[in-house]
Amino acid sequence: MSKKILVVDNELRSRQLIAHLLREENYEVDEADDGATALEILEKKNFDLMICDVVMPRLSAFDVIDHMKSRSLSTSIILITGHSYLVAENGLESLPCFKKPFNMYDLLHKVKEILVK
């Protein structure tokens, strides 16, 4: 059974590129264009990993993560952002974080590393 990944990014091109790369590796991928939509999807389906942009309309990655913690969801998380200082300011420096623009194959390597655990 393939691993399930949720890709959350309000930047359409970035989201589609990440999703395409993951599908090429035979992962099952869902997409959300903002944090609120991500929460709706997370309520309906379990994921092995969420790749989430930090700054988005409606709800940020921090809001999504807070909700996931309150619901005891055990989904692994990778953050992507153009504002890496926000990750440290919100106490999430223990999470893997890729600063935009980043190498897609570095991201793919991290995905594989997380999902084999």
Where are the model-predicted features located?
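Hydrophobic/aromatic residues positioned on beta-strands within the core alpha/beta folds
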Residues: 78-82
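Short acidic/polar segment at the start of the alpha1 helix of CheY-like receiver
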Residues: 11-15
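Alpha4 helix (beta4-alpha4-beta5 surface) of REC/receiver domains from two-component response regulators
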Residues: 63, 83-100, 105, 109
